[in-house]
Amino acid sequence: MNKLEKLRKLLLEKELDGLLIDSSKNRRYMSDFTGSSGVLLITADEAIIITDFRYTEQAAEQAGQFTMVEHKVPMTEEIANQVKKLGINKLGFEKSHVTYSVYEQYKSKIEAELVPVSGLVEKLRLIKTEEELTILKDAAKIADDAFEHILGFIKPGVKEIDVSNELEFFMRKQGATSSSFDIIVASGYRSALPHGVASEKEIQSGELVTLDFGALYKGYCSDITRTVAVGEISDELHKIYHTVLEAQLKGMEGLKAGITGVEADALTRDYIKEQGYGQYFGHSTGHGVGLDVHEGPGLSFRSNEVLEPGMVVTVEPGIYVPNVGGCRIEDDAVITDNGNERLSFSKKELITL
């Protein structure tokens, strides 16, 4: 089944006559339309994209399976017109992507029962197509190449923000639209910050430097993390690094279809606890990656979702000790029938610059 057929099956299960898609990522996933304004209206028999005059040609070109409707009245009125025309009685809308203000407009204009739903398109997005996997591999390759490049740039006296800018510039030169999120460059005491976005701090000898970054390429995200040493580091930092490395290797080795997010999380967390650092690993082991840099499934002590072939996830254990430093190591991988296939291949053994 194609994407529309799969979604229509879900609509049938939910007893919905149609679904209104407001989310830009879900809109892109279902239609391939990359414009910044528009909604999709999908029923058992129709697939409509409603947009304004700025995007009519683009929508017609990109969203070939959809009937293009240009709204010359306010968007909500055009949606109401189409709902009435199609005879929709029960209309699902994406409750996680619609503001209360927009919902109030829908309620006042649309003559149908509005049914809040969540996760329908996101459920389809969990399993990547071959085309998506090819793009994700290319996005990871850009990040790998950027890591190799940045090793020659990092040295004492260089500011974290300059490292971040160099990574971004390099990835753009390799074809990325941008970085897939605000780049994390956290050195020294700041490496104990799990999300230490690059600052004006200068990198010093004797520090660990955590680099968490990825490429946004053809709409899809890569997300890798490597931690390097600048000069000689303390025994404690060595222990932290090698504990994280061993945990990450265990996580990758055990990652496979059929296990739950809780079980995947335990692959790394149990080892870190055994080494006495459990209290310093406060986030989940990983997450899905695709059109969003953080999406399902979760590799978390809260997630009972079962991993399936075709899902793309990160494995990223970390240890963060205040006033000492921290480390995270992260790979992207696709779940396969026989385990997993790495998408990122940058060296993980400790590199000293």
Regions found by a protein language model. Name each.
Residues 1-353:
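Active-site neighborhoods and metal-handling regions in enzymes and metal-associated proteins
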